[in-house]
């Protein structure tokens, strides 16, 4: 865990790797939940810093000058690659996903045997995974302190700029 297989560097906390030939849904979910907790800490901290710097350098001074009472501050969050995560977890849960590793034991690919429900097709099985993912991650966000006690909100967008991020990280 926490290893960037494309650049071959440890980029997050080291975690015991999954060593089985096939991905086990319960094992993956347990590790994935831990990683979401770790990521929520970093994500909220970075967004807090961004909001602080906006205030420090008067990024929104003109807009805020128009508000003459207590303003409702929001804290916008999102999940890049949401549909891909849902499809990946669905494949692990409903099909068989063989983990292909290189000579050093690093995952380099996956081989899916069988079919699985995909996100966006009105299949309640995929929708259940999507609902769990969004609720779980957003609950983790809400449990953290936000700058100026702003209220977290979230959106799930499928935008093409996220493709570039995935290519850079091997996703």
Regions found by a protein language model. Give the residues of each.
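Ordered core of a single globular domain
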Residues: 71-171
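Structured mid-domain segments that build the active-site/substrate or prosthetic-cofactor binding neighborhood
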Residues: 1-118
